[in-house]
């Protein structure tokens, strides 16, 4: 008789490192994981580079990790695909990108390039912006404006100024483009329906509201002088003679060059959904091109790179064999155990049930609440294990990754300790019902919260992860 349920637990950002300095996992009191590692079989795994369909040396991330786990095989990622398209020239023949260019020429209008200005490779890559600038130049589009969203999570926290300088140098070399606005990803790339943040970025893009600066580099320097690093840069409009260089207007074209959907959906909906309700605004008709389809329910957009279908995912296999499955996470990682785990498919499989726990909204950053909503997730997990309703449960604990990204090591230690406590409760519940628990991670983060050469590090890393089985 087979054991039931089988629980696949993803400890997000919980990697392996031999070093203890800056290692929140090693610094934490983790009696449960320590005991499990001694008494049950665990193996070391890789969650970066070519092991997960990324370029060699490229760090992994939550999306990539969950997509590979859910597929049960290597899935070649959008970063690799788009970079290759630029290299072999197919990028410059892309019909949707060309449509944006043609619209600008037809209406003598502006081309706006939105996205995360970063070499992190998690949501975007700066080389893709260069490709768009080259394409605009080749197609005779002269009014090109980059609205740069600043990173500081997948790159060092104060690297944005350098990326802006690199971009402006490349613009001068190609002969087209200006930086028209800046905004930290905290505002421009929210994914948890914090519409007040998104609205601030949206207003800077469409009406020129927000801070003002005469140059993008000067704006970054001013932000750093106020101890506000990249992720939290307040939406800032670059001006000339006291007026914004450019804002998005009717008949303009927009290309959103992020390839990862979860943090591009809200801003895209604000621009494209003519029935938008997130905040008050007037719909602006544009030719709006997304690198990927961030959300099938968002209308009035073009998709530059169509989804490559991933067949026979773990969820599909379970459904085909009549198994009931539950996906459980808090909202910060809900898309990862559903959309990404299912190979980029939004709709659930047959007999796939989903349980969503709201992430905290009473704190601006999770170092102020390192437990996040893990206690509620853990309680729901134990109830689901004991319910006898599900054959398979896929569950994500977000804390090591989300709190690790804050760079506050004591908070990350508390996050790891809270997760350890909840793992213990899940282990006991699984044993009580004679089930099986697999523990793994999607990528590393909390085990290396400092750069051993430069100090603070908030970025994903290429450290190995682990997989264990408890039965």
Region locations from a protein language model:
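Structural motif
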Residues: 8-10, 112-114, 255-256, 392-396, ...
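Metal-dependent catalytic core segments for phosphate chemistry
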Residues: 324-384
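Metal-dependent active-site segment of extracytoplasmic phospho-/sulfohydrolases and closely related
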Residues: 412-455
């Amino acid at each position: 008789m087979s054991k039931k349920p089988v629980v696949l637990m993803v400890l997000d950002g919980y990697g392996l490192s031999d070093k203890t300095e800056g290692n929140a996992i090693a610094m934490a009191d983790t009696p449960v994981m320590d005991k499990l590692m001694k008494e049950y079989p665990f193996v070391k795994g890789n969650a970066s580079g070519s092991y997960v369909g990324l370029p060699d040396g490229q760090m992994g991330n939550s999306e990539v990790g969950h997509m590979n786990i859910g597929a049960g095989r290597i899935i070649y990622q959008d970063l690799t695909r788009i970079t290759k398209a630029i290299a072999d020239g197919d990028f410059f023949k892309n019909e949707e990108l060309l449509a944006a260019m043609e619209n600008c020429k037809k209406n003598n209008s502006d081309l706006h390039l939105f996205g995360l200005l970063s070499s992190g490779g998690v949501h975007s890559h700066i080389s893709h912006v260069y490709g768009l600038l080259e394409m605009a130049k080749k197609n005779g589009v002269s009014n090109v404006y980059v609205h740069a969203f600043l990173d500081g999570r997948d790159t060092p926290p104060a690297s944005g100024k350098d990326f802006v300088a690199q971009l402006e140098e490349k613009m001068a070399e190609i002969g087209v483009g200006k930086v028209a606005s800046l905004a930290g990803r905290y505002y421009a790339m929210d994914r948890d329906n914090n519409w007040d943040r998104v609205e601030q970025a949206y207003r800077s893009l469409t009406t020129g509201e927000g801070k003002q600066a005469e140059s993008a580099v000067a704006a970054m320097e001013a932000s750093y002088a106020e101890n506000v690093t990249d992720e939290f840069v307040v939406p800032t409009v670059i001006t000339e003679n006291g007026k914004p260089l450019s804002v998005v207007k009717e008949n303009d074209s927009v290309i959103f060059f992020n390839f990862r959907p979860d943090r591009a959906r809200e801003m895209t909906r604000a621009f494209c959904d003519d029935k938008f309700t997130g905040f008050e605004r007037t719909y602006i008709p544009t030719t709006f091109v997304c690198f990927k389809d961030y959300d099938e329910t968002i209308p009035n957009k073009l998709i530059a790179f169509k989804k490559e279908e991933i067949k026979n995912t773990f969820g599909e296999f379970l459904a085909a064999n009549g198994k009931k499955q539950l996906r459980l996470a808090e909202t910060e990682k809900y898309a990862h155990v559903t959309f990404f785990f299912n190979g980029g498919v939004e709709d659930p499989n047959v007999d796939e049930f989903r349980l969503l726990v709201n992430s905290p909204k009473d704190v601006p950053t999770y170092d102020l609440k390192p437990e996040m909503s893990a206690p509620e997730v853990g309680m729901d997990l134990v109830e689901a294990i004991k319910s006898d309703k599900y054959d398979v449960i896929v569950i994500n604990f977000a804390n090591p990754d989300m709190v690790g990204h804050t760079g506050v090591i004591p908070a990350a230690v508390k996050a790891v300790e809270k997760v350890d406590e909840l793992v213990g409760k899940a282990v006991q519940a699984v044993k009580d019902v004679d089930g099986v628990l697999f523990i793994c991670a999607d990528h590393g983060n909390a085990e290396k919260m400092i750069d051993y050469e430069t100090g603070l590090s908030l970025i994903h890393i290429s450290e190995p992860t682990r997989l264990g089985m408890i039965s």
